[in-house]
């Protein structure tokens, strides 16, 4: 009976990015992460980082430091939808502007290498009515 219990041991998925475990990614510098990333991300970082993303990263670090132990940090709002998610941002809460409101998104390991704008949709998806010619037909009042 004890062998049956041992056989059903639960295995939890550990996240990795291009073969590198999450623990190593968190210790990794942004320059080392960029070497793992696809060409579009490498090109973007090769062109240099302006002061706006650097200021945003500083605000994220401050929010993480100010957060109590085992609590989510305060959301940091941004209009920078073209910011690429790097390992340093994992665990942060970001308010991403979609043109109307700030959508709060918690940065998870699966989001690495993607743009912030991908997680804050800018339009309302269409909800179609009844299909066919019956929609324009006159409906008499009783």
Swiss-Prot record:
Short name of one Pfam family: Ribosomal_S19
Tagged with keyword Ribonucleoprotein: yes
Any one GO molecular function term: RNA binding
Cellular component aspect of the GO annotation: cytoplasm; cytosol; cytosolic small ribosomal subunit
Location in the cell: Cytoplasm
Modified residues (N-acetylserine): 2
Keywords recorded for this protein, A-Z: Acetylation, Cytoplasm, Isopeptide bond, Ribonucleoprotein, Ribosomal protein, Ribosome biogenesis, Ubl conjugation
Single Gene Ontology BP annotation: cytoplasmic translation
First-listed, main subcellular location of the protein, grouped into a coarse class: cytoplasm
Transmembrane annotation, as ranges: none
InterPro entries for the chain: Ribosomal_uS19, Ribosomal_uS19_CS, Ribosomal_uS19_euk/arc, Ribosomal_uS19_SF
Glycyl lysine isopeptide (Lys-Gly) (interchain with G-Cter in ubiquitin) crosslink residues: 24, 35, 64
Highest taxon of the lineage: Eukaryota
Protein family (similarity comment): Belongs to the universal ribosomal protein uS19 family.
Subunit (UniProt): Component of the small ribosomal subunit (SSU). Mature yeast ribosomes consist of a small (40S) and a large (60S) subunit. The 40S small subunit contains 1 molecule of ribosomal RNA (18S rRNA) and 33 different proteins (encoded by 57 genes). The large 60S subunit contains 3 rRNA molecules (25S, 5.8S and 5S rRNA) and 46 different proteins (encoded by 81 genes).
Role played: Component of the ribosome, a large ribonucleoprotein complex responsible for the synthesis of proteins in the cell. The small ribosomal subunit (SSU) binds messenger RNAs (mRNAs) and translates the encoded message by selecting cognate aminoacyl-transfer RNA (tRNA) molecules. The large subunit (LSU) contains the ribosomal catalytic site termed the peptidyl transferase center (PTC), which catalyzes the formation of peptide bonds, thereby polymerizing the amino acids delivered by tRNAs into a polypeptide chain.
Protein's name in the database: Small ribosomal subunit protein uS19
Organism of provenance: Saccharomyces cerevisiae (strain ATCC 204508 / S288c)
């Amino acid at each position: 009976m004890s062998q049956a219990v041992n056989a059903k041991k639960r295995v939890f998925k550990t996240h990795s990015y291009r073969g590198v475990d999450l623990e190593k990614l968190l210790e990794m510098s942004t320059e080392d992460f960029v070497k793992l990333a696809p060409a579009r991300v490498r090109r973007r970082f090769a062109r240099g980082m302006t002061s706006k993303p650097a200021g945003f990263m500083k605000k994220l670090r401050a929010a993480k430091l100010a957060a109590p132990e085992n609590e989510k940090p305060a959301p940091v709002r941004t209009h920078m939808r073209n910011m690429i998610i790097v390992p340093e941002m994992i665990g942060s809460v970001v308010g991403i502007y979609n043109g109307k409101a700030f959508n709060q998104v918690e940065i998870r390991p699966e989001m690495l290498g993607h743009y912030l704008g991908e997680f804050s949709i800018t339009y309302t998806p269409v909800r179609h009515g009844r299909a066919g010619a019956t929609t324009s037909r006159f409906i008499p009042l009783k």
